[in-house]
């Protein structure tokens, strides 16, 4: 029993020791992490501000601002060549006292600005042409409306002239019919066709002392006998005027 109790005590002591060591290790790790971060931040501050802002900007040629003369020389080179070769780039950078990579970046940005400018000019031209096309379309639409109005007026005038011509023709035909009825003429078709006695007037033969016209021998009409006519209407016509 004593041995069993000693083993339990040893196990408890070992477990407590292991737990304490683990807790200590975790505490050390948790305490070292913020210290490492602080050291890194301090180191970064020292690197950024140890030499001063003027020394960093002035000492590093990549971060130096370009002077007016350098910009002018780069612009002249860009007008001659849009994209520089490696040898030309290195030579120009050595002449201007710049880094070849900085010259390459400047040319890349300058090409992008040049392309944007060309796109803006092209857009301006297209917009101007679009506005002109819209204005021309409006003029054409107004012209179409005016032509439609003129067409309506012309159609009304044509209808008016046609109605006037129709009424004039009808009145002229009525006058001709009245003139024929007043002259005493008789219009007849074939001898077998029927006719109205009201439209024809008998000719006046000269009687005794009537003052009428006297017919000569040449004016006499030879009328055959009654039995020679097959149509009774002709016979009636001749008998009506006393020719039989």
Curated annotation (Swiss-Prot):
One of its GO terms (biological process) is positive regulation of DNA-templated transcription. Expressed in roots, stems, leaf blades and panicles. Residues 108-167 form a coiled coil. Its main location: nucleus. Transmembrane segments: none annotated. Residues 25-64 are annotated as: Disordered. PROSITE patterns: HOMEOBOX_1, HOMEOBOX_2. SMART domains: HOX. Residues 35-44 have a biased composition (Basic residues). GO terms for cellular component: nucleus. It is found in: Nucleus. GO terms for molecular function: DNA-binding transcription factor activity, RNA polymerase II-specific; sequence-specific DNA binding. Residues 46-56 have a biased composition (Gly residues). Keywords: Coiled coil, DNA-binding, Homeobox, Nucleus, Transcription, Transcription regulation. Residues 59-118 bind DNA. Belongs to the HD-ZIP homeobox family. Class I subfamily. Probable transcription factor. This is Homeobox-leucine zipper protein HOX14.
């Amino acid at each position: 029993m004593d041995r069993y109790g000693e083993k339990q005590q040893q196990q408890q002591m070992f477990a407590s020791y292991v737990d304490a060591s683990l807790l200590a290790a975790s505490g050390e790790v948790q305490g070292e992490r913020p210290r490492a971060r602080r050291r890194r931040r301090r180191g970064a501050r020292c690197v950024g501000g140890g030499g001063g802002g003027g020394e960093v900007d002035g000492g590093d040629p990549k971060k130096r601002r370009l002077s007016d003369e350098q910009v002018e020389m780069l612009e002249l080179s860009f007008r001659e060549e849009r994209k520089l070769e490696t040898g030309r780039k290195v030579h120009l950078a050595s002449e201007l006292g710049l880094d070849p990579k900085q010259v390459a970046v400047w040319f890349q940005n300058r090409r992008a600005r040049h392309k944007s400018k060309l796109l803006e000019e092209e857009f301006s031209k297209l917009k101007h042409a679009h506005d002109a096309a819209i204005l021309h379309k409006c003029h054409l639409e107004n012209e179409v409306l005016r032509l439609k109005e003129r067409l309506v007026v012309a159609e009304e005038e044509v209808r008016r002239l046609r109605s006037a011509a129709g009424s004039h023709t009808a009145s002229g035909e009525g006058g001709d019919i009245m003139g024929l009825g007043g002259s005493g003429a008789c219009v007849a078709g074939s001898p077998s066709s029927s006719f109205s006695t009201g439209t024809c007037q008998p000719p006046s033969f000269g009687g005794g002392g009537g003052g009428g016209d006297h017919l000569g021998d040449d004016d006499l009409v030879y009328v055959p006998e009654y039995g020679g006519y097959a149509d009774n209407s002709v016979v009636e016509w001749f008998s009506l005027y006393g020719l039989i």
